């Protein structure tokens, strides 16, 4: 299958290409970048040297239509709206890695992004790209919108608890820690100001909250509100979500593990962490770098009736490019693990 990547110069575009060059069923036929037209891909993405001799092209819808069966859009938020619409109208399959088609309600974009979506009639054409929740819809989709990195990491831990009415849906608090690559590849804070930090950002109203609320509300069949507070930490890749919930059913630990096994036992990219010995007693993003896994665990605070659901992932993999490739595999009928059979890198 022939694929293109629009916006291939950033971290997410580069990670998507890293996975595509090793995919057994894919040929990369076109990559675009506004600022690097004519340059060899490996000069901007040095890790790809020796894997491809492609050069960056200008964005040209006719060429993309002629050369590609499927296109990944890895451009900044707000930029993808017109690109996705143009490709959709030409009948191309699209996997969008921006936030522009994640939310299905115009009012939600007004609330979380502060802008009016220019094509609200296209929002319901998009399928939210979490195969563990929407696999059958993704199989039939023309447009899949990949989730935000913190959103998918959190919701995979919370979804079984919501679906089975285990927790109080009025009191869910998500505490997220994320590495610096989550901020993108643009010039940012100097190393002296970024190194060693544990820095809150958007402790209220982070836009990924809207995705979590959308998906959990759909599962619950009622409106759910979530409190979410992210923190930037001194790692390059990785997310840890500490999801604080309060139980409305009496359940023992073994019953909760059974519930998670029933939900994710057949899933290729969800691992349940419950070791009593060793270093890895709870999910830890350090042991996920370079992989598409989301690791889930929990602990019980019986004194306060609190269930702490823990989840971790690599924000550039399960939180972005890995999910994109997984969605492509589902859309196109490939083995879901094609191009994603990577064990995590350790040590890092």
Swiss-Prot record:
One Gene Ontology MF term: N-acetyl-gamma-glutamyl-phosphate reductase activity
Gene3D superfamilies: Dihydrodipicolinate Reductase, domain 2, NAD(P)-binding Rossmann-like Domain
SUPFAM superfamilies registered for this protein in UniProt: Glyceraldehyde-3-phosphate dehydrogenase-like, C-terminal domain, NAD(P)-binding Rossmann-fold domains
Cytoplasm is among the record's keywords: yes
Domain of life: Archaea
Reactions mediated catalytically: [amino-group carrier protein]-C-terminal-N-(1-carboxy-5-oxopentan-1-yl)-L-glutamine + phosphate + NADP(+) = [amino-group carrier protein]-C-terminal-N-(1-carboxy-5-phosphooxy-5-oxopentan-1-yl)-L-glutamine + NADPH + H(+); [amino-group carrier protein]-C-terminal-gamma-(L-glutamyl-5-semialdehyde)-L-glutamate + phosphate + NADP(+) = [amino-group carrier protein]-C-terminal-gamma-(5-phospho-L-glutamyl)-L-glutamate + NADPH + H(+)
SMART domains assigned to the protein according to its UniProt record, in alphabetical order: Semialdhyde_dh
Residues binding NADP(+), per UniProt: 9-12, 315
EC annotation from Swiss-Prot or TrEMBL: 1.2.1.103, 1.2.1.106
EC category: oxidoreductase
InterPro entries: AGPR_type-1, LysY, NAD(P)-bd_dom_sf, NAGSA_dehydrogenase, Semialdehyde_DH_NAD-bd
Protein's pathway: Amino-acid biosynthesis; L-lysine biosynthesis via AAA pathway; L-lysine from L-alpha-aminoadipate (Thermus route): step 3/5; Amino-acid biosynthesis; L-arginine biosynthesis
Active-site residues, record numbering mapped to chain: 149
HAMAP family in UniProt: ArgC_type1 (MF_00150), LysY (MF_02083)
Protein name in UniProt: Putative [LysW]-L-2-aminoadipate/[LysW]-L-glutamate phosphate reductase
Gene: lysY
């Amino acid at each position: 299958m022939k694929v293109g990547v629009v916006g291939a110069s950033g971290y997410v575009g580069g990670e998507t290409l890293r996975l595509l060059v090793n995919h057994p069923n894919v040929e990369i036929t076109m990559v675009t970048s506004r600022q690097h037209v004519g340059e060899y891909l490996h000069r901007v993405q040095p890790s790809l040297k020796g894997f491809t001799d492609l050069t960056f092209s200008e964005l040209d819808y006719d060429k993309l239509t002629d050369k590609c069966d499927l296109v990944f859009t890895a451009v900044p938020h707000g930029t993808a709206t017109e690109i996705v619409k143009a490709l959709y109208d030409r009948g191309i399959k699209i996997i969008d890695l921006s936030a522009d088609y994640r939310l299905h309600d115009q009012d939600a974009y007004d609330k979380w992004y502060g802008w009016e979506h220019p094509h609200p009639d296209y929002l319901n054409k998009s399928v939210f790209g979490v195969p563990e929740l929407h696999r059958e819809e993704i199989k039939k989709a023309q447009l899949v919108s990949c989730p935000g990195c913190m959103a998918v990491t959190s919701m995979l831990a919370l979804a079984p608890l919501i679906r089975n009415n285990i927790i109080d849906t009025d009191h869910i608090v998500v505490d997220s820690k994320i590495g610096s690559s989550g901020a993108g590849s643009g010039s940012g804070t100097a190393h002296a100001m970024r190194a060693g930090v544990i820095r809150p950002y958007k402790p209220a109203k982070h836009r990924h909250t809207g995705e979590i609320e959308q998906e959990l509300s759909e599962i619950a069949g009622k409106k759910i509100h979530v409190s979410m507070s992210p923190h930037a930490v001194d790692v390059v890749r990785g997310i840890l979500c500490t999801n604080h919930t309060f139980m409305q059913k009496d359940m023992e630990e073994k019953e909760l593990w059974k519930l998670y096994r029933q939900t994710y036992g057949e899933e290729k990219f969800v691992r349940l962490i419950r070791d009593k010995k060793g270093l890895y007693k709870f999910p830890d993003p350090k042991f996920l770098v370079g992989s598409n896994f989301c690791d889930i665990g929990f602990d019980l605070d019986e004194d306060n009736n609190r269930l702490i659901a823990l989840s971790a992932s690599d924000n550039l993999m399960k939180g972005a490019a890995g999910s994109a490739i997984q969605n492509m595999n589902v859309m196109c009928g490939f083995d879901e693990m094609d191009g994603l059979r990577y064990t995590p890198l350790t040590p890092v």
